[in-house]
Amino acid sequence: YYKTSHFATVSGLIYRMSRNAAGLASICILSTMVLVTVSTTMSLYKGVDAYAAVQWPQDMTLTLMTDPRTNTVPDVAPVLRVVDDAMTRTGLTQSNVHGYRTVRFSALRSGDALDLTSKQLTGSSADEYTVMVLDTEGYAGLTGEQVTLAPGEALAWTDGAAFGDTLTLGGDTLRLRQLDSFSLVSGSSIMGLHTLYLVMPDLDSVLELRAQQNAYTSEHGGTRSMLNYTYQFDLSGTDDEQLDAL
């Protein structure tokens, strides 16, 4: 290399090799980023259907929420008439129709007890649960299974660790009958939260639990629960025809 006969030739070759190496390194880095971008985009694209299937298991979901002025769910009859008119206008048909009322609130789990106050709720803790409460009539409409529950008794299913034979909510204790599965699917687990489903004997017991939960949170702090009516169904026709029905 240091010989005068080929010093210029060899030094020029080494210089060009170093420049080429820098260029190749840049190309490798850019190629890697292209692969990462393509794979991430494809994963997101492919995962959209799976996410939608969990979050919205049926073609149409209508939710009527508690009116804060009257603290009641609006009358569902006008909404159902609008749906019927849309079916008549478009010629589409409904199937797998489900209508049910639920009370929904968040709580922090400690063993077989749920803390109804939201002071420690961060939205990221593994002990945070979304609690969905419905009555046996709504459960029968979803599953086709008729069940009879005694006062103070509830069916329970969770996608987290199973609860014991009892559950303490605020100052009240429920006797639990565990379910092996549950047809009402929520997207809470996708967001990192577990979901607990409770089936109460009747609507009055659901409303009583809601009143107790709201009274407890009013005294100790926390978020008041809402009574919602959910109407779900599948539609015949193509995606475009379903959109026209809206």
Stretches with model-predicted labels:
Residues 11, 42, 90:
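Short alpha-helical basic/polar micro-motif
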Residues 26-29, 230-232:
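Glycine- and acidic
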Residues 21-23, 40-46, 111-119:
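Short, charged low-complexity intrinsically disordered segments located at boundaries
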Residues 52-246:
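Basic-flanked hydrophobic alpha-helices used for secretion and membrane insertion
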Residues 32-58:
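Alpha-helical transmembrane segments
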Residues 1-28, 34, 38, 46:
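Feature of multi-pass inner-membrane transport and sensor proteins
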